């Protein structure tokens, strides 16, 4: 089940409202994988009264319907009209906060997202590949010249060829680029 949480990044005033779902038998003294889910443009909001928009798709939707996961799930809400790529520094500070306050296994932090969040997955992964065990972008677009930064981690991209918002060739281009440079990327 999702709970509503919030965090203000010190020194920046950046407010992150987020949904949090903990494992069924959660033990604060344990150690858990962390999955961060970045939503698409349609789920942006104010981080408080509009936070449930984040649970329209993917992992947070299933958690809100009662599905339990063996990992900690964090789903932050991006402000209206914004893009994840503009908030990488703030997201890193937010991740530092999560690691400091939750029993996160730092070797098992996974980043996923769809559409705008899929693009955010590529961009945050390109900027900070050393922080993630793997990236799972869904219908996102990355920056082709940044694939070199993702060679050290597995990337599994998902994209449907009927997507009218972002053409599937964006994902094909990223996955092929990573593999052409010796990386470990898969496309579904």
Where are these regions (language model features)?
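Primarily recognizes the serine-hydrolase "nucleophile elbow" in alpha/beta-hydrolase
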Residues: 100-101, 107-151
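A domain-start/cap signature at the N-terminus of enzymes
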Residues: 1-34, 112-119, 124, 136, ...
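Alpha-helical scaffolding within the catalytic cores
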Residues: 51-65, 94, 138-148, 169, ...
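Active-site machinery of serine-nucleophile hydrolases
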Residues: 34, 38-92
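Solvent-exposed loop/turn segments at secondary-structure junctions
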Residues: 40-44, 78-83, 115-119, 140-144, ...
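Active-site-adjacent alpha-helix of alpha/beta-hydrolase-fold enzymes
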Residues: 161-186
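Gly/Ser-rich "nucleophile elbow"/oxyanion-hole loop immediately N-terminal to the catalytic nucleophile
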Residues: 24-30, 79-116
């Amino acid at each position: 089940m999702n709970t509503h949480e919030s965090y203000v990044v010190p020194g920046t005033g950046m407010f992150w409202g987020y949904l949090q779902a903990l494992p069924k038998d959660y033990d604060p003294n344990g150690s858990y994988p962390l999955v961060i889910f970045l939503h698409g443009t349609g789920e942006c909001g104010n981080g408080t009264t509009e936070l449930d928009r984040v649970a329209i798709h993917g992992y947070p939707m299933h958690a809100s319907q009662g599905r339990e996961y063996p990992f900690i799930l964090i789903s932050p809400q991006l402000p209206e009209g914004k893009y994840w790529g503009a908030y990488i520094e703030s997201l890193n500070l937010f991740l530092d906060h999560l690691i400091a306050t939750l029993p996160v296994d730092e070797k098992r932090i996974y980043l996923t997202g769809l559409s705008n969040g899929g693009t955010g997955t590529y961009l945050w992964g390109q900027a900070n590949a050393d922080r993630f065990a793997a990236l799972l972008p869904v219908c996102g677009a990355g920056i082709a010249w940044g694939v070199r930064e993702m060679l050290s981690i597995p990337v599994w991209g998902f994209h449907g060829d009927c997507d009218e918002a972002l053409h599937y060739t964006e994902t094909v281009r990223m996955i092929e680029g990573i593999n052409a440079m010796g990386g470990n990327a898969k496309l579904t």
